[in-house]
Amino acid sequence: MSKGIVLLAAGGTGGHVFPAEALAFKLKERGYSVHLVTDSRAERYAGKFPAEEIHVVPSATIGSKNPVAVARSLWTLWSGMRAAKRLIQRLKPVIVVGFGGYPTVPPLLAATRLGVASMLHEQNAVMGRANKALAPRVKAIAGGFLPESGDVFSDKTVATGNPVRPAILAAAEQPYLPSHPGEPFNLVVFGGSQGAQYFSKAMPTAISLLDDGLRARLRVTQQVRPEDMEMVSGCVAKLEMGADIAPFFNDMAERLAQAHLVICRSGASTVSEISVIGRPAILVPYPHALDHDQAANAAALAATGGAKVIPQSELSPERIASILSHVMNDPDKLSHMAAAAKLAGKPDAANLLADMVEAIAAGKTVSEFKRTRA
């Protein structure tokens, strides 16, 4: 018999959906039924999501200064809140948990107005706009990188870490095996769940600048956006090297486990997954993020020695080639970075978050939960 329904709400990108998925697996193991509220984009990432049902509720971003666009967005949000209210009244969840992104706004607002227990999980070191708007209303906040002191919402924040998917936990069981000079070197390049055009342009040029011996060692996995596939594939073909190029890899966890070096953006899920698996990384924060959240996430891992942070403006193809030339012949350095990243990882984040969800659903305060955790 189910302990009750937990309604998870997540924006439709991998960065929001993946940690919600990890929590969903834990809650199902504990006897709960899980439903997901999201938007239409999530279908790409929610294929393995263990939800009884996935509900799409209208939502919108209020980012335009155009009065007509703002009015349209407000109407969509109001419609979404009505739909979310009906959904919550029908499902009667014991708690609603939001993972960020504007699709979480209608269900979380509806939950707080209906008196249903509610909490947020913020993946980043800087709170996103949707979560920031909802934070004063919810009972508790779980943080991937948020502090438990010194912040306006610290009194109801628990630093759980970011839950990672079962595939990542399985990959974390594989030790880091360094590549010595002359041996194949696995390089994984990706820009988060939606790709990064910058890497599509920079990496082929950087690899072309390597000497023949180093280039022959490279085994590249590179995620590229669909519109960049033809360009990158053509460049790789000219280089006559081993490479897997695709818009999305369903086995990315295994590819990360095999990596000797990762070059990537620094979204919260990415940083968390790299640290749990324990792989050295060059982190290139997305430069146009409004809240500079990726820079803060990257700094957190770099402080442990598990990664090096390089702003995109400073990372030319020539510099990438120089970095690869050095680290491909310095396995000890990469091994030390891998070990430091592993120490920074929080593989038990999903269990701790599930504990917190159960406590808040049962009516406990954050202070009470912290005391029982100590």
From Swiss-Prot:
Q: How does it sit in the membrane?
A: Peripheral membrane protein
Q: Where in the cell is it found?
A: Cell inner membrane
Pathway it belongs to? Cell wall biogenesis; peptidoglycan biosynthesis
State its Enzyme Commission number(s).
Answer: 2.4.1.227
Tell me what reaction this enzyme catalyses.
di-trans,octa-cis-undecaprenyl diphospho-N-acetyl-alpha-D-muramoyl-L-alanyl-D-glutamyl-meso-2,6-diaminopimeloyl-D-alanyl-D-alanine + UDP-N-acetyl-alpha-D-glucosamine = di-trans,octa-cis-undecaprenyl diphospho-[N-acetyl-alpha-D-glucosaminyl-(1->4)]-N-acetyl-alpha-D-muramoyl-L-alanyl-D-glutamyl-meso-2,6-diaminopimeloyl-D-alanyl-D-alanine + UDP + H(+)
Query: Which controlled-vocabulary keywords does the entry list?
Result: Cell cycle, Cell division, Cell inner membrane, Cell membrane, Cell shape, Cell wall biogenesis/degradation, Glycosyltransferase, Membrane, Peptidoglycan synthesis, Transferase
What InterPro entries does the record tag this protein with?
Answer: GlcNAc_MurG, Glyco_trans_28_C, GlycoTrans_28_N
Q: Under the GO molecular function aspect, what terms does this record hold?
A: UDP-N-acetyl-D-glucosamine:N-acetylmuramoyl-L-alanyl-D-glutamyl-meso-2,6-diaminopimelyl-D-alanyl-D-alanine-diphosphoundecaprenol 4-beta-N-acetylglucosaminlytransferase activity; undecaprenyldiphospho-muramoylpentapeptide beta-N-acetylglucosaminyltransferase activity
Q: Which domain of life is it from?
A: Bacteria
Q: What is its main location?
A: membrane
Q: Which GO terms describe its biological process?
A: carbohydrate metabolic process; cell division; cell wall organization; lipid glycosylation; peptidoglycan biosynthetic process; regulation of cell shape
Family that this chain belongs to:
Belongs to the glycosyltransferase 28 family. MurG subfamily.
User: What is this protein's record name?
Assistant: UDP-N-acetylglucosamine--N-acetylmuramyl-(pentapeptide) pyrophosphoryl-undecaprenol N-acetylglucosamine transferase
Q: Which organism is it from?
A: Rhizobium etli (strain ATCC 51251 / DSM 11541 / JCM 21823 / NBRC 15573 / CFN 42)
